[in-house]
Amino acid sequence: VADCYVSKNGALTLRSSVLVSMTMAELSQQGKVTVGTLRSSDPALFITGVADGARAITDVLALRGGELTNLVLSAITGVSGEVSRFSSVYPMDINGDGVTEVPRTVSLQGGDADHAVSQRVDWISYDASGTASRVLSTYHDVADGWYLQLPEGWPERVWVGRSASPDEIGITFYTDSSREESYVPVLRITALSGSERERLAVRTGRFILGRNDGVIYVGELLKGNQDWKYSVTEDEVRASFSLIGTEWSAGDN
């Protein structure tokens, strides 16, 4: 239960209460409380808990008519309807528009629903009535510290594969141009961490996306990008690429 108190004559008085999906014990593990904003510009609290270490459940709390309300709580189940596979990503303003978006993990077309590599993240905003709207989609490589805002046409049309060696970890995006042929690679993003990373970063076809803690991130446009309807340029990849920062969560001490 979440309580809303008001200050009156120097004392706090309980104004209203609302059910939330997770207990404090559950929130203290991998949970996070985010102070944010709805599409209607109203302030809101986004409370994310993780059930069984696998499912992210987010409640969205806001004042409606002066009463605390859980905008996404199901009257039937008593639990938030904003549930998806946990991907170590929490609500944030993903696109800098001043509105807080909730990450919703979705299986990529043809992907393994239980495999983190095969997941994209849809970012969902809410208004004061609890109406959801998808803002954009990203591919988050949390383990390697980066994410890519998926270009127009990509979310429902790409597969992803991961390759790893001691000094290089690569994520390759493939098109679905033909289900009867092998997947066609479009873009590869590689994290270089070995002693040869500076030399490898400027290998033919590669372009640098960013650097962080001894790691160089590079992109490489592949053959499937050339004639594809949703092809991208190097500059578009750079603009869509971001490093993942460290954030506080309810379980941090």
Question: For the regions a protein language model found, what residue spans apply to each?
Answer:
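Secretory pathway targeting signatures of secreted, lumenal, and periplasmic proteins
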Residues: 151-201, 207
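Surface-exposed amphipathic alpha-helical segments
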Residues: 219-253
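Surface-exposed beta-loop interaction hotspot
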Residues: 38, 121-148
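Acidic/hydrophobic-patterned starts of short beta strands in beta-sheet-rich repeat architectures
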Residues: 1, 37-49, 94-106
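Loop/turn-rich, solvent-exposed surfaces of beta-rich toroidal or solenoidal domains
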Residues: 38-66, 151, 155-161
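Repeat-based blade/solenoid architectures
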Residues: 20-34, 76-90
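Structural motif
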Residues: 1-7, 52-65, 108-128, 132, ...
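Beta-propeller fold detector
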Residues: 14-22, 70-76, 133-139
